[in-house]
């Protein structure tokens, strides 16, 4: 395109046919120059020449909008801002990594790996401190992008990802799969972060605390124009789903990264293959030494078994691969002054001491508070108000007081005294024998507990009241509209218009969401009650075992321990909860308000043909939602596990089944497809 005389081109009358050809050529040329600049680091034209080509394309697209193509570089910034992000279910779960915090941890990981598959090489790469992103290309064109989310479901950030100039809208060349999912890290380079905060400072706006927060906030903008102004970058670090399965991929992780690079995707230049354990440690030390000089923030390095066949043999545990680990850098530490201690009250009444610190910059953020956990921790540290303390950001995330500096203790230092009465409601603070945590005895009489309990009650995994966010709950309680969860169902739209920034339309929508939440399941209801130590899985097991709330209310500790995965401690918490009159009053009020769920029929032996069996689901199911499939298998008596082992009875393999399928075949585990699973469900209705 450099040979085109742009001025003549734009001034001439051009036929639609010629315009379409020129626009396609310009798009291809600009996309190629983007890759040469951001990926190859070898630009072949100047910035001004690139700008002239771009301006030419912009003017032609304005004149012939019917010929604008999806991969045009002008389409990186979308038009209208979104109202909210849609949810995307990942075709293949986006797992997290286990951590190693020293040579001993990594050596133990290395031994586990080599004991299983023999000698290995590692592909080593910096652990970028950004946001994990999945990008799906179909026929070489960027189709969608999503955040990791909870690993199963993420948010659709396609329009924002398109604004990242280093991410190609169309893959380079023709030798790529029909469908390819690219996984990597979106991040904000240090220079871009400094420039962003400089602009904010000039406008007297709030500053971002670190590049990671800036990157996350930028990617979650509903207006992609804002994202485009933030100068984000991206490095690919793995492949996700690839279709067809027969496509020839590299046999090592490093080779696959080079394939990604050949398609025009940016890959870190700091990646290195290490064949020996000493080389891995040398790589770690080298990156750690150069950490402050790198153009981006990192919090460690990632070591992956390089051989793909060995990766498949090693497989996965519930939330992470067995063949990779994040070798974290030591947390950064600073000294500061303990100026005071505040006591906070949580949802379950836990009274937690929180240190008020002289603000100190550590690990990339300014820290002014840190939890002291409980009285035992205060005693262990021997800490007093007025002490100089050492602050560490554990894992570069959570501020933690790790020690005091005794020689700096002033004569005026004072003991930290736990309150005898709740700082919120004045009720007695109790510490049961054998427990580290002191608790307010006020229950829902305590405003702090009310707020946290009702936030939990309305949360997505509980009664899932759409629009009932934390700030709404806080206002409802502050304005004395709600005292207990049952009061939520007495709210009207007109009552909720009293809340800040709550118009009649929003209030009407929230009232409808509250009404809809009356229909739930026993498992969700039990989880929503906020019984100590009762999470989603335990609530589901309790619901399935007792089948009714009435039966559960009178269950003994002995009866409760008969429930799958319920131990003595959890059983005691459940029994104690249902023994409290004020809790029973709340439950009765909720039932009276109309909260209900379908009856659970106690399964007969014939209705549970899979009782005692362990099943595993893997790959993409086309006709079933994975959670529905899991629930139906559990109804038939099966235990649904997250990984394949010698104890697995059957693996359900959907599309792109991957390593779990290989492991099942290796162990001789029975494998069925989705059609067979549907037939099983149909036969047992």
Swiss-Prot record:
Binding residues annotated for Zn(2+), in chain numbering: 422, 425, 440, 446
Positions contributing to NAD(+) binding: 47-51, 96-97, 125, 148, 185, 304, 328
Enzyme class: ligase
Keywords: DNA damage, DNA repair, DNA replication, Ligase, Magnesium, Manganese, Metal-binding, NAD, Zinc
Cellular-component GO terms for this entry: cytosol
Record: active site: 127 (n6-amp-lysine intermediate)
One Pfam family, short name: HHH_2
Classification via PROSITE patterns: BRCT, DNA_LIGASE_N1, DNA_LIGASE_N2
Reactions the enzyme catalyzes: NAD(+) + (deoxyribonucleotide)n-3'-hydroxyl + 5'-phospho-(deoxyribonucleotide)m = (deoxyribonucleotide)n+m + AMP + beta-nicotinamide D-nucleotide
Signal peptide: none
InterPro entries, per database record: BRCT_dom, BRCT_dom_sf, DisA/LigA_HHH, DNA_ligase, DNA_ligase_AS, DNA_ligase_CS, DNAligase_adenylation, DNAligase_N
GO aspect biological process, one term: DNA repair
UniProt GO MF annotations: DNA binding; DNA ligase (NAD+) activity; metal ion binding
Family to which this protein belongs: Belongs to the NAD-dependent DNA ligase family. LigA subfamily.
Protein name, as recorded: DNA ligase
Organism: Shewanella putrefaciens (strain CN-32 / ATCC BAA-453)
Gene: ligA
């Amino acid at each position: 395109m450099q040979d085109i005389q742009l001025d003549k081109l734009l001034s001439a009358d051009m036929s639609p046919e010629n315009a379409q050809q020129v626009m396609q050529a310009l798009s291809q040329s600009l996309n190629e120059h983007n890759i040469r600049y951001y990926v190859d680091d070898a630009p072949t034209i100047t910035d001004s020449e690139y700008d002239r080509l771009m301006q030419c394309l912009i003017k032609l697209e304005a004149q012939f909008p019917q010929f604008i193509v999806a991969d045009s570089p002008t389409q990186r910034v979308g038009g209208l801002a979104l109202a909210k992000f849609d949810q995307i279910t990942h075709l293949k779960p986006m797992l997290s990594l286990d951590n190693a915090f020293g040579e001993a941890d990594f050596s133990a990981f290395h031994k586990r790996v080599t004991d299983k598959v023999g000698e290995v090489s590692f592909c080593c790469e910096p652990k970028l401190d950004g946001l994990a992103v999945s990008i799906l290309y179909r026929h070489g064109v960027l189709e969608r992008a999503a955040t990791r989310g909870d690993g199963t479901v993420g948010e659709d950030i396609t329009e924002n990802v398109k604004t990242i100039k280093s991410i190609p809208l169309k893959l380079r060349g023709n030798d790529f799969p029909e469908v390819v999912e690219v996984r990597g890290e979106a991040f904000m380079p240090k220079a871009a972060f400094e420039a962003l905060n400089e602009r904010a400072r000039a406008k007297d706006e709030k500053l971002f605390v670190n590049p990671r927060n800036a990157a996350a906030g930028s990617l979650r903008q509903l207006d992609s124009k804002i994202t485009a102004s933030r100068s984000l970058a991206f490095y690919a670090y793995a492949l996700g789903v690839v279709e067809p399965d027969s496509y020839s991929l590299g046999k090592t992780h490093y080779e696959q990264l080079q394939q990604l690079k050949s398609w025009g995707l940016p890959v870190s230049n700091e990646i290195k293959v290490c064949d020996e354990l000493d080389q891995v440690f040398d790589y770690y030390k080298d990156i750690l030494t150069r950490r402050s000089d790198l153009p981006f923030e990192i919090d460690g390095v990632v070591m992956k078994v390089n051989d793909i066949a060995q990766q498949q043999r090693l497989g996965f545990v519930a939330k992470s691969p067995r063949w990779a680990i994040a070798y974290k850098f030591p947390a950064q530490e600073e000294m500061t002054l303990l100026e005071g201690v505040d006591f906070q009250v949580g949802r379950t009444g836990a009274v937690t001491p929180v240190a008020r610190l002289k603000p100190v910059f550590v690990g990339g953020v300014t820290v002014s508070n840190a939890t002291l956990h409980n009285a035992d921790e205060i005693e262990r540290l021997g800490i007093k108000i007025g002490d100089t303390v050492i602050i560490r950001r554990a894992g570069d995330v959570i501020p933690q007081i790790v020690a005091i500096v005794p020689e700096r203790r002033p004569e005026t230092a004072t003991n930290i005294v736990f309150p005898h009465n709740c700082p919120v409601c004045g009720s007695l603070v109790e510490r049961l024998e054998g427990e580290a945590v002191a608790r307010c005895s006020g229950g829902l009489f305590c405003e702090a507990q009310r707020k946290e309990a009702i936030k939990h009650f309305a949360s997505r995994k509980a009664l899932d009241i759409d629009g009932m966010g934390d700030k709404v709950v806080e206002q409802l309680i502050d304005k004395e509209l709600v005292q207990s969860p049952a009061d939520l169902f007495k709210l009207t739209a007109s009552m909720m218009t009293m809340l800040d920034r709550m118009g009649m339309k929003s209030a009407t929508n929230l009232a409808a969401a509250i009404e809809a939440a009356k229909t739930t399941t026993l498992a969700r209801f039990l989880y929503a009650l906020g019984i100590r130590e009762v999470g989603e899985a335990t609530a589901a097991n309790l619901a399935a075992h007792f089948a009714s709330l009435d039966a559960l209310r009178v269950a003994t500790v002995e009866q409760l321990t008969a429930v799958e995965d319920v131990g003595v401690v959890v059983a005691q918490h459940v029994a104690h909860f249902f023994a409290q009159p004020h809790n029973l009053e709340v439950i009765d009020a909720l039932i009276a308000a109309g909260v209900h769920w379908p009856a659970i029929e106690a399964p007969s032996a014939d209705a549970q043909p899979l009782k005692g069996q362990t099943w595993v689901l893997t790959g993409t199911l086309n006709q079933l939602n994975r959670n529905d499939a899991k629930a139906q298998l559990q109804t038939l008596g099966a235990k649904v596990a997250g990984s394949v082992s010698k104890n697995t009875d059957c693996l359900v393999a959907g599309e792109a089944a991957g390593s779990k399928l290989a492991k099942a075949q290796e162990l001789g585990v029975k494998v069925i497809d989705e059609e067979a699973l549907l037939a099983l469900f149909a036969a047992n209705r």
